[in-house]
Regions:
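Positively charged n-region of N-terminal signal peptides that target proteins for export
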Residues: 1-4
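Small-residue packing motifs within transmembrane alpha-helices
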Residues: 6-9
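N-terminal signal peptide c-region/cleavage motif recognized by signal peptidases
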Residues: 11-15
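Soluble non-transmembrane domains of integral membrane proteins
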Residues: 18-158
Length: 158
């Protein structure tokens, strides 16, 4: 099975428009295309940040790496991905990688079949190593992306 590693170099930000990729893509840096929302109070929920009216609070990140320094804020990353493949293509396993191991809390949210965002993975340095979906130094997550469809991925970092 072939894999795509979507690398969030040192913690890549979220994007303003969908990033297109196809079966020939092997590495897709997202730092300059993701969007970031700083939640200073840490009170925003996935229902709030994924609502259309909330979209203007996200800012496009213009650097390769997100560097928030030492902060008590929660950071939400938003990544819009568009898997360019014929709708009849066989499902593939894609990987999202955060190449920045020192994160205390990290949550991945994906839409369910009704488009409602659900927590699909929770991990981080504050949790046991076994909490990682794929046991590797960087954080790796499988993404079930459907051929020919755009998907928005949310990451909550604290």
């Amino acid at each position: 099975m072939r894999y795509l590693v979507i690398v969030l170099l040192g913690l890549l930000p979220v994007l303003a428009r969908a990033v297109d990729f196809d079966d020939t893509t092997r590495h897709l840096p997202l730092g300059r295309v993701m969007q970031v929302y700083e939640d200073r109070e840490g009170s925003a929920s996935i229902a709030q940040v994924s609502a259309p009216l909330f979209a203007n609070r996200f800012r496009t990140h213009h650097e390769d790496v997100l560097n928030a320094g030492y902060s008590t804020s929660v950071f939400w990353l938003k990544v819009d991905l568009h898997y360019l493949a014929p709708a009849r293509s066989a499902p593939r396993q894609w990987l999202l990688e955060l190449a920045y191991p020192p994160l205390d809390h990290l949550e991945l949210y994906l839409p369910d079949s009704d488009g409602v965002y659900r927590l699909v993975q929770r991990t981080g340095d504050a949790l046991p190593y076994d909490s990682r979906q794929i046991r590797q130094n960087n954080y790796l997550f499988t993404l079930p992306l459907l051929p020919g469809q755009a998907t928005t991925v949310y990451l909550r970092l604290h």
